Amino acid sequence: MLQYRIIVDGRVQGVGFRYFVQMEADKRKLAGWVKNRDDGRVEILAEGPENALQSFVEAVKNGSPFSKVTDISVTESRSLEGHHRFSIVYS
């Protein structure tokens, strides 16, 4: 099991992107969360098997129908926070 912290740049707020991310995470049985940041980007913390996380990152790069991802950064960690499901964090 690994943890990925992902920062997504582009048109990713106000376009259903967090819901899209949650659906993609649920398809892969990943745990963690997604939230909007004050700087206009979206932050994701996802935990699960490496192959599922890699597939998830590809889906996030492609984005949802109304989003436009321009940049993505991924930080990998072996320390897990022990999430049991994937959720949207509302601020």
UniProtKB/Swiss-Prot annotation:
pH dependence: Optimum pH is 5.3.
Active site (catalytic residues): 18, 36
Superkingdom of source: Bacteria
Gene Ontology MF terms in the entry: acylphosphatase activity
Pfam families: Acylphosphatase
Catalytic activity: an acyl phosphate + H2O = a carboxylate + phosphate + H(+)
Acylphosphatase-like domain boundaries: 3-90
Family named by the database record: Belongs to the acylphosphatase family.
PANTHER family: ACYLPHOSPHATASE
Name of the featured protein: Acylphosphatase
Organism (species): Bacillus subtilis (strain 168)
